[in-house]
A protein has these predicted regions:
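C-terminal target-recognition/interaction regions appended to catalytic cores
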Residues: 1-124
Length: 124
């Protein structure tokens, strides 16, 4: 339900009580809701799958409606080809895999530049 998503994604400052009776102020800033399509994506976490609302799951607006990202989109955000995790496992397991994956394309590109600079330095 939309109100659950809005609460979880919204900023909050609430008085809470720990099990031992200690009272404290819990606060967290807002998370973009829905996620902006014109900005870099937030990190995909292992909890991306499943049905329930969550502060960390990605939600986008398309044609005036809110929707979650599908596994192929999660694959692509992690720089894997579309369908990379489509091995017959459930969508929830596919989302978990992408939340547990490392984005290797960017570090690889950085490494190529570093290696090229090292080669130039050695030849000087």
């Amino acid at each position: 339900n939309l109100s659950s998503w809005e609460y979880l994604k919204g900023g909050k400052k609430e008085q809470r009580t720990a099990r031992n009776g200690y009272e404290y102020t819990y606060s967290e800033g807002p998370v973009a809701f829905p996620d902006a399509l014109d900005k870099p994506s937030r990190t995909i976490l292992t909890g991306e799958g499943g049905r329930g609302a969550s502060r960390t799951k990605h939600v986008v607006e398309q044609n005036g409606r809110l929707r979650r990202l599908v596994p192929d989109e999660l694959d692509q955000l992690q720089m894997f080809p579309r369908g990379w995790t489509d091995t017959g496992m459930t969508d929830g397991h596919r989302a978990f895999c992408m939340g547990n994956a490392l984005v290797t394309g960017i570090p690889h590109r950085i490494g190529v530049v570093i290696a090229a600079d090292a080669d130039v330095s050695r030849s000087e």
